[in-house]
From Swiss-Prot:
One Pfam family this sequence matches: Tropomyosin
Family per similarity comment: Belongs to the tropomyosin family.
Gene3D superfamilies per the UniProt record, alphabetical: 1.20.5.170, 1.20.5.340
Native species: Lepidoglyphus destructor (Storage mite)
Region described as Disordered: spans on this chain: 22-43
Name recorded for this polypeptide: Tropomyosin
PANTHER family in alphabetical order: TROPOMYOSIN (PTHR19269)
Role of this protein: Tropomyosin, in association with the troponin complex, plays a central role in the calcium dependent regulation of muscle contraction.
Domains (record comment): The molecule is in a coiled coil structure that is formed by 2 polypeptide chains. The sequence exhibits a prominent seven-residues periodicity.
Length: 284
């Protein structure tokens, strides 16, 4: 009987212990459920935050793509502008070379005109001296004929010089198509000068040219000098225009360089913002 009681007490004690363990297990189960629910809530929060970060990352990447596209467009525009600048520089160089050749022609023509004027003046002075001498004196007539021969030689030498200049001008004409009309005008004037020199030779030969005709030739020379002076002024005006074009082109180059610097700074700012955003995302 005593053994049964002891066994009953042991069973009761075991029952109580089992109940306690069951309550503890239930409490642990409730605690585990609470922790699981809290963990699930945290997971949902993290997933939501990750989704939000991914959306922001997509927006940032899209902005970066747009910025890169704009930058590429700006670089293409800049390359096009640089090509235009190079073309303008080549064009200005050609204009300057054309102007230099024109100025060379003008100097040659001016020098030729001066030589013609000097020869004509010398011939005119000789003609006046011959007119005032008495042609009845045989010895003086021989002297006049000798001077006339010298004048003819001077005129022929001038003709040879003018022929040489004309050949040089003809060679230059092949490289100066834009100034062809001016060259033709210059050659026409050279022919006129040669014709006037031949007239001077005839005057020296015949001694019958009057003072009025000499005055007309002098006026013609002065008119040709005025024409040459006008051409020189035109050449100087073209040089000034070319210089203004170069200055304008330099301003355009400076503006494009400033725009390029601005775009580079803008691109650097965007890159810095992206780096900062990536750093913040990495920190999460």
């Amino acid at each position: 009987m005593e053994a049964i009681k002891n066994k009953m007490q042991a069973m009761k004690l075991e029952k109580d212990n089992a109940i306690d363990r069951a309550e503890i297990a239930e409490q642990k189960s409730r605690d585990a459920n609470l922790r699981a629910e809290k963990s699930e809530e945290e997971v949902r929060g993290l997933q939501k935050k990750i989704q939000q970060i991914e959306n922001e990352l997509d927006q940032v990447q899209e902005s970066l793509t747009q910025a890169n596209t704009k930058l590429e467009e700006k670089e293409k525009s800049l390359q096009t502008a640089e090509g235009d600048v190079a073309a303008l520089n080549r064009r200005i160089q050609l204009i300057e070379e054309d102007l230099e050749r024109s100025e060379g022609r003008l100097k040659i023509a001016t020098s030729k005109l001066e030589e013609a004027s000097q020869s004509a003046d010398e011939s005119e002075r000789m003609r006046k001296m011959l007119e005032h001498r008495s042609i009845t004196d045989e010895e003086r007539m021989e002297g006049l004929e000798s001077q006339l021969k010298e004048a003819r030689m001077m005129a022929e030498d001038a003709d040879r010089k003018y022929d040489e200049v004309a050949r040089k001008l003809a060679m230059v004409e092949a490289d100066l198509e834009r100034a062809e009309e001016r060259a033709e005008t210059g050659e026409s004037k050279i022919v006129e000068l040669e014709e006037e020199l031949r007239v001077v030779g005839n005057n020296l030969k015949s001694l019958e040219v009057s003072e009025e005709k000499a005055q007309q030739r002098e006026e013609a020379y002065e008119q040709q000098i005025r024409i040459m002076t006008t051409k020189l002024k035109e050449a100087e005006a073209r040089a000034e225009f070319a210089e203004r074009s170069v200055q304008k082109l330099q301003k355009e180059v400076d503006r494009l360089e400033d725009e390029l610097v601005h775009e580079k700074e803008k691109y650097k700012s965007i890159s810095d913002e992206l780096d900062q955003t990536f750093a913040e995302l990495t920190g999460y």
